Amino acid sequence: MKSLFRPLIVVFVVLVAVTGLAYPAVMTVFGQAVFPAQANGSLIEKGGRVVGSALIGQQFDAPQYFWGRLSATSPMPYNAAGSGGSNLGPLNPALKDQVKSRLDALKAAGTDLSQPVPVDLVTASASGLDPEISPAAADYQVARVARARKMADADVRRLVADHTSGRQFGVLGEPRVNVLKLNLALDAAQAAH
């Protein structure tokens, strides 16, 4: 009986050592050496203080800021520990209420709703944590942000263009705008004037 369990125990210990200790240790050292910013969460600093991550969305609802996608996380928006979509189907009345609520917020902030609203401004993402919006969603908000900041639309559009990332490797994904980075650039541009 002892000879039956010995190989099982040896394989178990070896697999735990390799997959639970050696592999994670090697990947941690590799990540810290080759991609230190990404391995530490792609943190964004302002004035020597961490203000967020380039990978996790934040809630902006003041008219002078660009707004990101809705967050479906609970108990609070953009809760990284509670990542997940709303799973609301297209016929669910709760989705309709959520979209109407966001449209009302856009209207209350002075956004012109005469043009079609980009879908990423009124719906949540699958993760509920998206830090980026489409260039169309950013462009849709330019007039409101420029008016709230007393800046020229052209200056705000230039910042949007400067913070628009293209497709990864030229083919993967869609062009996108990181909302936190864009809002920090807006603050810096306004402070410089």
Curated annotation (Swiss-Prot):
Subcellular location(s) of the protein: Cell inner membrane
A Pfam match: KdpC
Keywords: ATP-binding, Cell inner membrane, Cell membrane, Ion transport, Membrane, Nucleotide-binding, Potassium, Potassium transport, Transmembrane, Transmembrane helix, Transport
GO MF entries: ATP binding; P-type potassium transmembrane transporter activity
Xref: NCBIfam families: kdpC (TIGR00681), PRK00315.1 (NF001454)
HAMAP family reported in the protein's UniProt record: KdpC
Free-text function comment from the UniProt entry: Part of the high-affinity ATP-driven potassium transport (or Kdp) system, which catalyzes the hydrolysis of ATP coupled with the electrogenic transport of potassium into the cytoplasm. This subunit acts as a catalytic chaperone that increases the ATP-binding affinity of the ATP-hydrolyzing subunit KdpB by the formation of a transient KdpB/KdpC/ATP ternary complex.
Family: Belongs to the KdpC family.
Record note on quaternary structure: The system is composed of three essential subunits: KdpA, KdpB and KdpC.
Name the record gives this protein: Potassium-transporting ATPase KdpC subunit
